[in-house]
């Protein structure tokens, strides 16, 4: 049976959703690349106003799952349902959904000669336009200023990004995503290039934004300690299968060592688990 993109209600209204609701749910998803199956029968849900971390070793399908959620990768089988945002095969609907999704990458690709606020405004630009300051309307500049204020950088709005620290540039990247007023915020290893203290600070920013703005935040992380510290929920992938799905507080060092022996900070010498045929641990 092929993949099914489920019809949804009209786009929008996320800020009226209960914090306990799930914005996104995937059921029985499999993704293949050539003859290799990258994700095997994955089922997971992603709640509104919460931060979900997707963790696991390299090559287990974390980034593939992110590509699935932003509509860039089509599954071979399974269903994808969005409470308020739908990814459909019809191009117009897909574009509408992408307008409500923002992705933050490790390489935030700012333009050093532009100010922080001009870099943020580029989040609104049509990619066909030149990457240079445009005569933005007042309303757009107000939105950019608010986005910078949300990440604590309003005082540096006119400073060129080449003059900012690494952490400040990362915040500009977050603000550029926020100016689009997304309902879904995705991050692919967004803290890989910053030190642990700054990563925790930025992680706290994501949690605050999720709660205050009603965002569904999904982060791919390889730092397991950081995932426990900043996420509300953790999904652990092993060989393309869900090995853990539950509250971050339940993902303790012992469980981490059992599921991810190669990544675990614990030096437990118990034998590693075999490839999971099903979810090892799911805690609601």
Curated annotation (Swiss-Prot):
Keywords attached to this entry: ATP-binding, Cell inner membrane, Cell membrane, Membrane, Nucleotide-binding, Phosphonate transport, Translocase, Transport
Span of domain ABC transporter: 24-264
Primary localisation category: membrane
Database matches in InterPro entries: AAA+_ATPase, ABC_transporter-like_ATP-bd, ABC_transporter-like_CS, ABC_transpr_PhnC, MetN_ABC_transporter-like, P-loop_NTPase
Membrane topology: Peripheral membrane protein
Presence of the UniProt keyword Metal-binding in the record: no
Name of the protein described by the UniProt record: Phosphonates import ATP-binding protein PhnC 2
């Amino acid at each position: 049976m092929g993949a099914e993109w489920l019809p949804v209600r009209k786009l929008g209204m996320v800020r009226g959703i209960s914090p306990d609701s799930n914005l996104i749910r995937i059921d029985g998803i499999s993704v293949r690349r050539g003859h290799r199956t990258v994700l095997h029968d994955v089922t997971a849900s992603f709640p509104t106003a919460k931060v979900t971390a997707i963790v696991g070793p390299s090559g287990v399908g974390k980034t593939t799952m992110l590509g699935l959620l932003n509509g860039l990768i089509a599954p071979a089988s399974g269903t994808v349902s969005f409470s308020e945002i739908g990814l459909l095969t019809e191009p117009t609907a897909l574009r509408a959904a992408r307008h409500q999704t923002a992705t933050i990458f490790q390489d935030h690709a700012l333009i050093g000669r532009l100010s922080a606020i001009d870099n943020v405004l580029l989040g609104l630009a049509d990619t066909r336009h030149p990457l240079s300051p445009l005569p933005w309307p007042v309303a757009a500049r107000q939105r950019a200023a608010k986005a910078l204020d949300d990440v604590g950088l309003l005082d540096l709005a006119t400073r060129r990004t080449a003059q900012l620290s690494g952490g400040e540039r990362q915040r500009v990247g977050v603000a550029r995503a926020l100016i689009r007023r997304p309902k879904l915020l995705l991050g692919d290893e967004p803290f890989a290039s910053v030190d642990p203290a700054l990563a925790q600070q930025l992680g706290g920013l994501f949690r605050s934004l999720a709660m205050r703005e009603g965002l569904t935040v999904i982060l791919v992380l390889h730092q397991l300690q950081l995932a426990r510290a900043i996420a509300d929920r953790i999904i652990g992938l092993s060989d393309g299968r869900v090995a853990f799905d539950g509250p971050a507080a339940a993902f303790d060092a012992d469980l981490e060592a059992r599921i991810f022996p190669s990544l675990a900070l614990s030096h437990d010498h118990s034998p590693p688990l075999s490839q999971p045929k099903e979810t090892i641990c799911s805690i609601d």
